[in-house]
Amino acid sequence: MKELEYPFDNGFIMKKKRSLKRQLLGDGAVRLKKRVAVLGGSTTDDIVSVLELFLLDMGFECEFYRSEYGQFWQDAVFSNEELDRFKPDIVYIHTSLRNLSFSPTPRSGEEEIEQGLNAELDRLSQAWDLSLIH
């Protein structure tokens, strides 16, 4: 679909996402079905709706699981019956700066920053590794 080719107009895509989806679903293409879990640290509705368009255009028809707002960590690390039943083929962890536990200050020393960064990477790696188990 031309509208989804680079360089694309993200404002147009957001405005016309429903009609673009109808066009893609109505084109008669055979698509591979996949289940995608989107574990979000922030609102993921727009991410999912746009991701769905690009995946449809690339030949994938996806069913999506969305974590509750800010629950990416809990869904990834702890057992979640709904997510377990969903059995995702793909897990996408959508986080932002707000989801970081460590926040250095201008007075933070190099060692403190290094330790904080390593702890943050360990935490995110744990979420990623455990999300793959579900």
Predicted regions and their residues:
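N-terminal secretory targeting modules
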Residues: 1-38, 44-61
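Short alpha-helical segments and helix-capping/turn motifs at coil-helix boundaries
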Residues: 22-23, 49, 72-81, 124-130
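Conserved aromatic-histidine-acidic binding/catalytic patches
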Residues: 35, 39-43, 112-119
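Glycine-rich, histidine-containing beta strand-loop boundary motifs that form or position
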Residues: 40, 66, 94-95
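Short, solvent-exposed loop/turn segments at secondary-structure junctions
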Residues: 43-45, 70-71, 96-100
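A short beta-strand-loop structural module common to alpha/beta enzyme folds
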Residues: 58-73
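Oxyanion-hole/transition-state-stabilizing segment in secreted/luminal serine hydrolases
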Residues: 76-124
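Conserved small/polar residues in nucleotide/adenosyl-binding loops
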Residues: 133-134
